[in-house]
Structure formats: structure tokens, C-alpha cells
Amino acid sequence: MSALSSENVNGVYIPSALLVFGTFLVKKEFVPYAVALTAVLAGFKLFTGDSKARKVLNPTEFQEFVLKEKTDISHNVSIYRFALPRPTDILGLPIGQHISLAATIEGQPKEVVRSYTPISSDNEAGYFDLLVKAYPQGNISKHLTTLKVGDVMKVRGPKGAMVYTPNMCRHIGMIAGGTGITPMLQVIKAIIRNRPRNGGTDITKVDLIFANVNPEDILLKEELDKLAAEDEDFNIYYVLNNPPQGWTGGVGFVTPEMIKERLPAPASDVKVLLCGPPPMISAMKKATESLGFTKARPVSKLEDQVFCF
């Protein structure tokens, strides 16, 4: 936060000046003591004000955030790191929710808005990261590819019906396709971060089916494999349309048989999370229903057994 910000002017400098001036009017010889006192209090206020984590998201208004870094993962996938106003700021995004990005796109009659889930969390202050795959028809994803470091992006949030809380169910099954892994990773990391061995209370089991076309399309594989290796209650099953020779994972589309074998069976304390391309999600809704899960609604609610991001 700037030393000349309105918060400091109204909360530090003006009260300090009034204290010194008031002391001068009442008893001039006490002015040096008043100056010393205000210096100490102002210094404390400035220091603690800068060190306190502040949630910056606004659910009703778009704000502009500066692109700090761009890391290319492949020819059409990048991680965009946006800076928050000050190093101690956090987004203030509940686990399971997402943000809206907006931009004016040439040829579009009005501002285009799309939803994305950061792959960073509020444990990482001062910035947030977005993993984005650029699609030929993707207005916002293509717009992001044109941004240079120092450019800004309009962001609003949080939004979404899912708010994950520790132990909200005994066992979670996940089915993700492509960039649909981002909300899953957010939940997975929150669960593992809050395990008893890490000082938390979350004992939720998590099984993930992650489907992609080619091996090189598997996003965040290194991080996912590391999490699975460190946590015995988190398991991943990869599925590829075009597997390499010697592939031991699933092949083709995700089937009811794969779901039955790899994910928990229907129960009152079980939840299935879905995120991926629309055709895949449509197929997964039918598959989970055929296995005895409650039929997924067109628009998911937190209490649903099958929840679609």
C-alpha cells in the first residue's frame, strides 16, 4: 500500500496532525511528546496495515489486475500470474469457487465474460495464477494470449455454488477433462493441506479420473503425481484417447465401468465432482445416473450428490 494512499491519509496523517495541533493549543510544552507519540503510533499503523492479509475480490464490481508473469506450458497452454495491489493481499476466494474475467473483444457487441478457477490459493499472497488453454473460438482465452507483462485484466468474484469445507463428505470422486482439472486441483490441494499430519482435520478420501486426448495434454501432471505420492488417500487414474506404447491407464472415453471401478460407490456421504468439455459432462451425468447416483441438475447446488462446476 502506498504511503500516500487515502487509507493512510485519513487513518494516520490527519489524526496525527490533529493530535499535535490540539496539544499545541492546550499546552505548548507537551508538543514534543505529542510528536513522539504520533510518530510511534503512525509507524505501528503503517507497519501492521501493510502486513495484514486483505481480501481484494469484489463480487459486484470488476477490478483491474496487472499481468506480472506469463509461463508457457505448451504451444496453447500458459500460466498467467496477476499481481494483487500489495504483497500481503489475497484474493479471498473460497475453496471450490471461481472468478469472472471480462474483456472487450473486437467483433463482439458487448463485453465478454468467462469463468476461471485459479490454480493458486489464498495461502499464496500478493498474486494469483490462472492456467488457461487457448481455444480457436475462445474469446477470453485468445485475449489472454495477447496480453503483455504490465497489461491489465478485469476480474470479479467470487462466484459459484460450491464452497468446500473440511470433511463435508467421507469420499469424493472426481472426473475432469482437459482444463477442467483446475477446480479439482483447488479442492485436492485444500484437502491435503488440511490433513491431520499437517495440523488439520480433513480425512476425506479423493479419487480422480483425469481424461485427455494425448499424453502431452495432461496438464499439471507433475504436481498431481507428487500430491498422489505424498498422500495415500488421493488416487489418480489417467485416461487417454491416443495412448503411447506401454500405457497402463485408461483408453478412450471415460466409461461407466471405469467410474464403477475407480470412484466410490453411491452413498449419502459420497460426492462426485465433474468439470470438462460440455459433451463429456453430458456423458458423465448419464453415466453416474446409470450407476445409481442422484441425477445431476442442469445447474448444480452445493448439496447435490453429483456436482458440475
Curated annotation (Swiss-Prot):
CDD domains for the chain: cyt_b5_reduct_like
Domain of life: Eukaryota
Keywords of the record: FAD, Flavoprotein, Membrane, Mitochondrion, Mitochondrion outer membrane, NAD, Oxidoreductase, Transferase, Transmembrane, Transmembrane helix
UniProt entry tagged with the keyword Nucleotide-binding: no
GO MF entries: cytochrome-b5 reductase activity, acting on NAD(P)H; NADH dehydrogenase activity; transferase activity
SS bond list: none
Example of a GO biological process term: tRNA wobble base 5-methoxycarbonylmethyl-2-thiouridinylation
Major subcellular location class: mitochondrion
Ranges for domain FAD-binding FR-type: 60-165
Pathway stated in the Swiss-Prot or TrEMBL entry: Protein modification; peptidyl-diphthamide biosynthesis
Family: Belongs to the flavoprotein pyridine nucleotide cytochrome reductase family.
Subunit text: Monomer. Component of the 2-(3-amino-3-carboxypropyl)histidine synthase complex composed of dph1, dph2, dph3 and a NADH-dependent reductase, predominantly cbr1.
Function of the molecule: NADH-dependent reductase for dph3 and cytochrome b5. Required for the first step of diphthamide biosynthesis, a post-translational modification of histidine which occurs in elongation factor 2. Dph1 and dph2 transfer a 3-amino-3-carboxypropyl (ACP) group from S-adenosyl-L-methionine (SAM) to a histidine residue, the reaction is assisted by a reduction system comprising dph3 and a NADH-dependent reductase, predominantly cbr1. By reducing dph3, also involved in the formation of the tRNA wobble base modification mcm5s 2U (5-methoxycarbonylmethyl-2-thiouridine), mediated by the elongator complex.
Annotated protein name in UniProt: NADH-cytochrome b5 reductase 1
Originating species: Aspergillus clavatus (strain ATCC 1007 / CBS 513.65 / DSM 816 / NCTC 3887 / NRRL 1 / QM 1276 / 107)
